[in-house]
């Protein structure tokens, strides 16, 4: 496996971003809180910077104003010539790229943690680009070991040859927290508290790394996308059925060929006609209706994450 280089210096420039989607309220309110009371984000070797990523969408309690911000951090958006007619989120992505990046540069932030909620029953989902992200994989493993009761699942979103497009990709290292189920525009105390605890543990892990802790190699299980499935539709494009009760809320559970996936309004069931077992995620996600996605199909796979050696202390200045 070809892995990205492991950081060889302490991670000093760290950001926690909330409100990338303006109606995912755990991150919105945590970011707002930390902007006024940032002490919770301080550690001995660094202080994380809180960022409210999409202020306009947040003020309107909308996912986005003109364009999904978390799909906007590609070179085509970031490097194109600005115009007065640019969508709000394209302009905001460029601003965030200047603040936290520039993407793929030596000046970029060392780590960005991006906070999200989902209406799907994803539980505690850890989202990274790929298995090659060694620091992120060790962080995911640390969270799994710290909170076995949460069954933290790892979702690796980037397909082969695809450019990374989400907010945390502007940093040298990044991770997304995706917690649910929580309705859009609603703040649940349990989800809020869980996210707050996870953020603290992420920062604690970075502090461990900065202080010279070594992390051994390990085997990791994760999920990667292999396709998407739309709802059944009429000729006019309206829904003709919805997610079957036997599939609803079964994110990360195996879906076997022949199992029901949709219940038609006419009464019959539609069955999964694939040839192999898949693991659906983001099942019946509210934000994906407009994208024509009833659920994302993933495959489960196992891979080896190489060891992350301890940082070598910087030499003391000559006296």
Swiss-Prot record:
Annotated keywords: Cell membrane, Cytoplasm, Host-virus interaction, Hydrolase, Membrane, Metal-binding, Zinc
Topology term for the membrane: Peripheral membrane protein
Spans annotated as Hydrolytic domain: 1-210
Residues bound to substrate: 63, 70-71, 178, 288
InterPro entries assigned: AspA/AstE_fam, Aspartoacylase, AstE_AspA_cat, Aste_AspA_hybrid_dom
CDD domains the record matches: M14_ASPA (cd06909)
Residues where Zn(2+) binds: 21, 24, 116
Record-level GO cellular component terms: apical plasma membrane; cytosol; extracellular exosome
E.C. designation(s): 3.5.1.114
A single GO molecular function term of this UniProt record: aminoacylase activity
Region called Shielding domain, residue ranges: 211-318
HAMAP family per record: Aspartoacylase
Family note: Belongs to the AspA/AstE family. Aspartoacylase subfamily.
Protein name, per record: N-acyl-aromatic-L-amino acid amidohydrolase (carboxylate-forming)
Gene for this chain: ACY3
